[in-house]
A protein has these predicted regions:
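Non-cysteine beta-strand/loop elements that form the S-adenosyl-L-methionine
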Residues: 65, 271-289, 380-390
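A cytosolic small-molecule/anion-sensing beta-strand core signal
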Residues: 7, 24-25, 281, 491-494, ...
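His/Asp/Glu-enriched, well-ordered alpha-helical/loop segment
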Residues: 319-328, 336-359, 373, 384-505, ...
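Generic beta-strand/beta-sheet core signal
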Residues: 31, 134, 218-219, 246-250, ...
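Short, charged, surface-exposed secondary-structure boundary motifs
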Residues: 142-143, 256-258, 392-396, 436, ...
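Conserved, mostly hydrophobic/aromatic
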Residues: 144, 212, 274, 283, ...
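Phosphate/diphosphate-binding loops
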Residues: 240-278, 358-366, 397-423
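Divalent metal-binding segments
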Residues: 3-7, 14-259, 279, 286-320, ...
Length: 532
């Protein structure tokens, strides 16, 4: 048997430790001892010897936004270093001065404090060229007057949305600050050229490989409208897409579901697959828009925003998706959102008899014990964010105020899902969350904090072990993607995706993990990233 690559090192397959892996045509042919592997070498075999370093199955992200990530990295105003609205205005002003001539300027990663932004503030930078700045959590957007005019943001929107979504001034008119559905919808209307989106996708792929990500879930492939999907289709067709991507797109009615089914039949391939539909059930706690069962701590009688609350329609989505071998991926932050979505999906799964549809709920900040148990019973996958578990700036104080101390301390269960037998996968939500670090995710899952900035552990009783954390980034994520026979562990017959680090995650001191250095990322048996 001719072998293309032999990979040597301290290799964790997921269920055992070996010395060598042999690869042919991107598929693992042998897993075992170095001695036996070397017998398969010929003059054409590439030897990848990683010495004393440690090799793991390729890591995968259960919920990210790849195309926006690449677009932000390559084409956007980064507001992360600002702290006040004045800072964001000045950063925007400087960027536009250094990058003149664009038809629209987009920015990301600002944080809304107690002071609400207005279009007038951004008009100081430009009254004529549209400016659209999306918050760090991706759930709100700040526009100047030119952008409001371009996208039709006026009093008519108040007939459809509440003042918690289209914020208004004392005159009753929109101020230029939008949250939840109108903000997310507007982002999809910002037109990017095909060339910019394709380049953005390749920038994202390069970044993902540099973080040890070998496959990812794109949690809303319609972020920039239809051109987003076209970019994935074009880049994968060209052979340049090597980051296997499994995607959903937000739907609002059954026609959207059927359209996505038709699109999937045309564009799905080895490296890009539409696997289901997405539904935004609620918002986020820090924006005061998560749907809670009990009222907000700072506002009696207020339970958050119900971004989607049509039970029968969600049942129909799930049934229709099931007919076409698809699943439903729900944005669920609050316990009200979880209960609503779970009621609908359980009803649909009982009707179809399919308990293996692999529906998933992402984020899961506040969840009742009863619904954790139900998620396990109905095999709804818990896509959880370990890096969000600590209490940190800038949102920690807000979350405590909005949830109250008890709900805040119980935020982001992980161990409870495992205890009930549910499948968990990890997500970064990058770039909605600006951190993508697999070692930090492992550390946060164990310690309920991270070392990237000053923060304190929260809900320590939900800590899990390192092996469970590794599974949540490998074999469990493969299961979420419906790819557990191809990805997620290093076994004969599986795709040769793996990552190499200088730390033994399973045996070294836990405090070494955050500083683990990625040595190499391997996809289809070939090195796609090398830390030189």
């Amino acid at each position: 048997m001719s072998i293309d690559q032999i990979i040597l090192g301290n290799i964790y397959t997921l269920d055992r430790k070996v010395e060598a892996i042999c690869v042919k045509d991107g598929i693992i042919q042998y897993v075992g001892s170095k001695r036996v592997a070397q017998e398969l070498i010929d003059e054409n075999t590439e030897i990848l010897d990683f010495g004393d370093n440690f090799i793991y199955p390729g890591f995968m992200d259960g919920h990210a936004h790849g195309l926006p990530a690449g677009n932000i990295l390559g084409f956007s105003i980064d507001l992360l270093d600002g702290e006040t609205l004045e800072d964001y205005v000045e950063i925007t002003r400087k960027y536009i001065e250094e990058n003149p001539g664009r038809k629209i300027y987009c920015g990301n990663n600002w944080v809304c404090g107690n002071e609400r932004p207005t279009a007038a503030m951004l008009d100081e930078v430009s009254r004529d060229v549209p400016i659209a700045l999306t918050t760090l959590d991706g759930h709100s957007i700040w526009l100047n007057t030119a952008a409001m005019e371009k996208f039709g943001i006026d009093e008519k929107l108040l007939e459809k949305y509440s003042a918690n979504e289209v914020h208004i001034g004392e005159d009753g008119k929109p101020t230029g600050y939008l949250s939840e559905e109108p903000a997310i919808t507007l982002n999809s209307k910002i037109v990017k050229s095909d060339e910019e989106l394709q380049e953005s996708l390749l920038i994202w792929q390069e970044y993902a490989f540099s973080q040890g990500i070998t496959a990812a879930f794109d949690a809303h492939v319609g972020y920039f409208g239809y051109p987003s999907l076209k970019a994935y289709a074009d880049v994968s067709k060209s052979g340049k897409l090597k980051l296997r991507t499994y995607a959903v797109r937000t739907v609002k009615d059954t026609d959207d579901v059927l359209e996505l089914v038709e699109l999937a039949s045309k564009v799905n391939n080895e490296y890009f697959k539409i696997t289901g539909v997405k539904v935004f059930i609620d918002g986020v706690v820090e924006a005061h828009t998560a749907w809670l069962l009990d009222e907000y701590g700072d506002q009696p009688g207020y339970f958050g925003v119900k971004s989607f609350s049509d039970h029968d329609k969600l049942v129909e989505f799930a049934k229709l998706a099931n007919e076409h071998n698809m699943n439903v991926h729900c944005h669920t932050v609050g316990d009200g959102a979880v209960k609503f979505a779970l009621d609908a999906l359980c009803e649909a799964q009982i009707a179809t008899g399919n308990m293996d549809q692999r529906n998933a709920f992402a984020h899961l900040q506040v969840v009742t014990p009863e619904d954790i148990k139900r998620m396990s019973e109905y095999n709804v996958i818990a896509v959880v964010p370990p890096l969000w578990t600590p209490r940190e700036k800038p949102y920690g104080k807000k979350e405590m105020e909005y949830l109250g101390p008890d709900r805040d301390e119980d935020s982001y269960p992980i161990k409870s899902f495992l205890d009930e037998g549910a499948k968990i996968t990890f997500h970064s939500d990058y770039p909605v969350s600006p951190i993508m670090s697999m070692p930090q995710s492992i550390y946060a899952a164990v310690k309920r904090t991270h070392t990237l900035e000053e923060c304190e552990p929260r809900n320590l009783k939900e800590s899990i072990g390192v092996m469970d954390a590794l599974k949540a980034m490998t074999i469990n994520t493969a299961y979420q993607f419906g790819q557990e026979d191809n990805l997620g562990s290093l076994e004969i017959g599986k795709i040769a995706n793996m990552v190499v680090y200088d730390v033994d995650f399973l045996n070294d001191d836990i405090e070494k993990i955050p500083d683990a250095e990625l040595i190499s990322t391997i996809v289809d048996g070939e090195v796609v990233y090398r830390n030189i």
